[in-house]
Regions:
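Glycine-centered loop/turn motif at secondary-structure junctions
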Residues: 41-42, 134
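Flexible, glycine/charged-enriched surface loops at secondary-structure junctions
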Residues: 14-25, 44-49, 110-118, 137-142
Length: 155
């Protein structure tokens, strides 16, 4: 599955002119340091690449980094890795994946949780997890995500 995600990202960003408009610029050197540090945290599924913006030659633009982890890598995936960094966590089952999501939200908080599935059963179980953990759930979301939409109503 991780390789399938990586291939989809590669295809989406294959045209540099399109990629720079999708990705946007890196805002600070901390993101670049995290990208470098994250490369060695697990299996490198998709390495980050620099992309030059034709209209903004001084812009720093990077493609996403995808790192494969195991459930034993909790100290890594339960931390925030701000930037174009994604972790794919190998689990034994959907139930285990949903349990990790529930425990992460309960233990660390979250504004949103996303699930992508074609299975009505998986979606129903994800709804139960989100309700139990007290987090907003998006199902098969495409387009923009409003990460902080809940913040104004947090009380």
């Amino acid at each position: 599955m991780a390789e399938g995600i990586a291939e989809a990202v590669r295809r989406l960003l294959a045209d540099p002119a399109r990629a720079v408009e999708i990705l946007g610029a890196v805002q600070n050197d901390g993101v670049l340091r995290r990208l470098e540090a994250a490369r060695s945290l697990g299996k490198l599924v998709l390495d980050t690449q620099a992309v030059a913006h034709p209209a903004y030659p001084d812009a720093t633009i990077r493609t996403p980094l995808i790192v494969g982890l195991t459930t034993q890598d909790r100290a890594t995936y339960l931390n925030e890795w701000f930037g174009p960094i994604a972790f794919v966590i190998a689990t034994e089952s959907t139930a285990e994946s949903l349990g990790i999501a529930r425990d992460a939200v309960r233990g660390h908080g979250a504004l949103t949780l996303s699930v992508y599935s074609t299975s009505d059963d998986v979606i129903a179980r994800a709804i139960d997890v989100a309700e139990d953990a007290g987090v907003a759930l998006s199902i098969n979301l495409t387009g923009g995500v409003f990460v902080n939409q809940s913040a104004a109503f947090s009380d």
